[in-house]
Structure formats: structure tokens, C-alpha cells
Amino acid sequence: MRVGIPTEIKNNENRVAATPAGVHELVRRGHEVLVEAGAGLGSRVSDDDFRRAGALVVDGPDEVWRESELVLKVKEPIEAEYPRMRRDQVLFTYLHLAASRPCTDALLAAGTTSIAYETVQLDDRRLPLLSPMSEVAGRLSITVGAYHLMSAVGGRGTLLGGVPGTPKAKVVVIGGGTAGEHAAANALGMGADVTIVDLSLPRLAQLENRFQGAIQTRASSAYEIAAQLADADLVIGSVLIPGAKAPKLVTDEMVATMKPGSVLVDIAIDQGGCFEGSRPTTHDDPVFPVHRSVYYCVANMPGAVPETSTRALTNATLPYALALADRGWRAALAADPALARGLSTHDGRVTNAAVAAAFDLPAVPVESLLG
């Protein structure tokens, strides 16, 4: 199969969909890999690195998209890429379609078979292709939150861990999944006072055990979230409903009660955000004010640490990319229920129930396409 890897063109998206090691494995199995010139530079991977791995490096995105049967990307296509998508092509990438009607409509109009990393789901409900980037985003959320708490950039001037004789910053993590767990771990490591809020009592018990009582946990409710926000310095929103838009758990009314210069980081912004006032921002212009607080809503946080993120992403996605290339998408999905759950669109139809519900569209059962 001919596999294409275009350069990511979303703002400050420096990741690339495969490392030279991943390309080498595809080539070793008899596939032809086309890589757009410069695609790996943001991840410290040169064109020569890809050539040595066996890739054909081509100038510009048009040839990559035109000649490839399987396109591997990192982020969802943006408007400039819509005309390049086509019906006889498989797109394997993060999509977050429930938060983007334009991208959904473009995929349906093109008839592209799209498979979303973030909805590939194992029988135990784990999300193997989302988890590594959730780990990165969770850890980064504390790094960027701590930075924006500095008074020089508009924050309240609080050091997360304080120093002897001063109070620690209070960090509230809403959502105790992978991103929330890693945010809590990083905040705790920096000496902060950490509270995790989640709906699942069994998950809260797991987190208390994992952190050996060093964090506080609270059962989620609107009342509890409002109470926690009232004296929080840094709030991390890490709520996830696989494939669906994130629920708005933090209202503007709650934010109005927060300390001046407090910071809110919305990791869920890829899925529409879990704060009422959230809107996507970029690494170039990452924050905006809401009442007296600072919102950070960058939709591709792991793109800021591409050398780490690209390696972690390829480690997770490569086995599935190999299956798609080796067997073709129908056979690969028929053989692997986890991969089948990632199918989002095919031949102008939506196949993910959460995406269909978000836009009041009919959903075609994946099973009906694999028989």
C-alpha cells in the first residue's frame, strides 16, 4: 500500500505522524511511504532521516495526498486540506469531529474513510491512542498553568509549591482520567495542594490509592465544583466522553467567584471544552481573560513538545497503521474491534454514534460495513 505523511499545518503543530523507525517498519513490510519535505523538522527529524528509513520525500502536500491510499496525520484536517481528501482514501489521525462540524462536513463531502485515533477503544474501555497524548497534555497543563500564574504574564503571582512559611497553591483537577491523573502527579511533584473531582467513586478510590493519600478527592457535582473553584489558584479541565463533545461543567458564574489572576487550563478544548467560556486558542496567542481569571485553551498542547510527543504517538499508533496497510481497512477493522470503534466516516456517512448525535445526523453501524 502507498502510505502518505503530510506536514502538519495547524498553528504550531510540530509533531509528525511517524518517526523514521515507524517508516522503516512500513517499508520493511513492502509498503511505499511518501513523506512531505520538511514534515519532521519540528520534531527534529530531517528529510535525510526519512530517506534513510526508506521513505520517498516529495515536495509539497499535493503529491502526498494525491498518491496515497492511506494518509497518516496527527491533527484533524483544516480548511486548506479539505480539497485534498478523496473517496478512495483512508485517513488515520486525531479528528475530534464532535467539536467540528466543518471538518465533519468536509469528510462526508469527500467520501473519505476516516479513522479517529481518539475513539479507538479496547474492550476494557481504555483508549490506547489517546492515552499517550493525554499523558503529555496532563503534564503540560501544570507547566503552562504555573507559568501563567506569574504576575508578569497576568497571573496572581503564586508559586505552586510555595516556600517554607507560605501557603501552597491550590490546584483543582476536574476529571480523573489519564490527563487528570498526570496533571495531578505533576502538580503534586511541584508541591501544590491538589484536589481531583470526578463522578466515578471507584476511580477516586484508585487515585487516592495511587497517590497514597497525598491528594484530596471529591465526588463531582455542580455544587462541589463551585465550592472548589472559589479558592482555587489553578484549575485543570480534563473531562472526556469518548467521541462526544465535552460537557460544560464550569460556568461563567462559577468563574466570577474565583480569585483575581487565577488560571484555568482546558485540556478538553479539542472536544469543545469543559468550561462555559472556553474557545480554542493557539500557541501563538494562548490565553484570554474571563472575568478576573486567565483561560488557556490551546487545542494542540502536545505540539509544543514534539520530540517527545511524536515518539510517544508513533509507539502507540504504529501497530494499527501496520494493520491498515497490511490488510486494508475493512479486514483490519473486522479483525480488531478496538480499531473498528475508531471508524468515524465512510462513503459520505457518519459511523460514530457520538458524532452523529452531536450534529443530529444518522449513524451507520460499523458492523454493516464490514460484512
Residue ranges and their predicted role:
Residues R2, E8, P77-A169, V298-N300:
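Glycine/serine-rich phosphate-binding loop and adjoining beta1-alpha1 elements at the start
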Residues P6-V45, G154-G237, V287:
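Glycine-rich phosphate/diphosphate-binding loop of Rossmann-like nucleotide-binding domains
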Residues V33, V57, L91, S114-I115, ...:
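Hydrophobic beta-strand scaffold residues
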Residues E69, K75-E76, L95-H96, S221, ...:
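Short glycine-/small-residue-rich Rossmann-like dinucleotide-binding loops
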